[in-house]
Amino acid sequence: IKAYVRGTSQQMIWQSYYILKETLNYEIPKVVVLNVNAMRYGKDSDEVSEAYNRLTIDNMKWSKEKIEIIKESMTEEETFLSYVFPILRYHSRYDKLTKEDFEYLFKSKTNTYNGFLINKNIKPVENLPTKRTLASYEFPSECYYYLDKITKLCRENNIKLVLIKAPSLYPYWYEEYDENIKKYAQKNQIEYHILIEHIDDIGIE
């Protein structure tokens, strides 16, 4: 099966939309699998950060979609120009710049690992924070807005959209969250698979 992973750590739902939109400039897949975990995080969430924004955005090619994703994702402390000219992000170290900083400013070798350390070590979970009651289990409206746009984009391109909740123990995926997605999937006739229920089958320890 030919497949591509366009996801990154802590990728927000609006970022998934623009990355999908960019992908369709190069390839029309038969199926798009979307992890719905980010539906819990709105634009005012503490989980939105420059570090994760850059992990998602910096390696994208320059395009209309990259401009759009930057504008939608920037925190109040960020500037658009710092994405165009990354050197501006590190202006405080101007006196420490070397030849290599300029040599790789607009070109760099492909780094398929993007900072990840690949290993097979297993560290069992010892303690989990207590599951707390939330004031609301509703997803932010902007998350539904972009999920609608993803759904529409897939339909317009005759792509089958499959929603999943990837296995995770924490942060908790509440039953109420699950019901929200089930209702959305049923209303829009989309497959939804909660893989948390199949952790043993998948082989996650």
Predicted regions, residues:
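Short catalytic/ligand-binding loop motif for oxyanion handling, primarily in non-cytosolic enzymes
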Residues: 40-44, 93, 170-173
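Loop/turn elements at helix/coil->beta-strand transitions in domains of secreted/extracellular proteins
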Residues: 2, 28-31, 155-162, 190-191
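Membrane-embedded segments
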Residues: 1-68
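Active-site-proximal beta-strand/loop segments in catalytic clefts of secreted hydrolases
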Residues: 6-8, 35-37, 164-168, 195-198
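Active-site segments of SGNH/GDSL-like serine hydrolases
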Residues: 151-174
